[in-house]
Amino acid sequence: VLRFVTPEWQSSTLLVVLAASVALAAFLAPRTRWAELALLCCLLTPLAGVVLLHAWHLHYHPAAQFGWLAWALLFAVHFWALRRLAAQLPAGALSAAHVLGCWLLLGVLALELRYLLLALSEHYNAWRWLGWALLPSAYLWLMALPRRWPWPVAAYPREYRVLASAPLALLMLGWFWLANVVSAGEAEPLAYLPLLNPLELGLLFALGAVFAWARLGLAELGVESLRSQWLTQGVAGASLFALLTAMVMRTAHHWGGVPYQLDALLDSMLVQAGLSIVWTL
């Protein structure tokens, strides 16, 4: 493929080849009772992840060059193969395949959303930050709900609600702190309004998702109830304090003309007055 296909079409072609190969293997494995062939089907998402890393760049568009069709085909084959081969695969391999597939699906969708949000701006502003976090945060919100979801979540609740969600929760918490500190909150063409702007609404959405998942997920990981309560409340409190502090600085930047640089913000009387009021509350 790398030799005969032009570079812009290589990733889509590789994904289709992988999907077709695994579909054939998943079809033959139960008929031939070939356990090793069934196990090879679990390599679909890791190999697709390698293709994604090979194709990725700052303006990567997963849906380009019929990528939308290639990725849709790959994920359809992935879930079909796992359902067809469930009785033939070792429990550990089956569990890992579900978790890796979940991460890959969210990653591809997040990259596509990020690309679409890039069209809203020319600078690295709040829209680009939101592209990374909205879908993983929405997933955490959904997994925190007590309702029963259809297959595969219903059949493998620990894989989707706990094993796949725990690293995402840590990732979203890290994203919260990084975006809160680094981003000045520009979201052209929208004007900046404290707490009512895309960045800070997105930060609250991500933090709420982490908190909602942690209330149930930490117990599934074996964390004691009292310790879990202290941990979630402590992290949420510290994060909200950091958000309000940065909100004051962003407000001074947009409304008071203070450069969004640490030295300038700390030296600003406007920032100091705003922090005094917010911290007193």
Give residue ranges: language-model regions.
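Alpha-helical transmembrane segments of multi-pass membrane proteins
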Residues: V1-L281
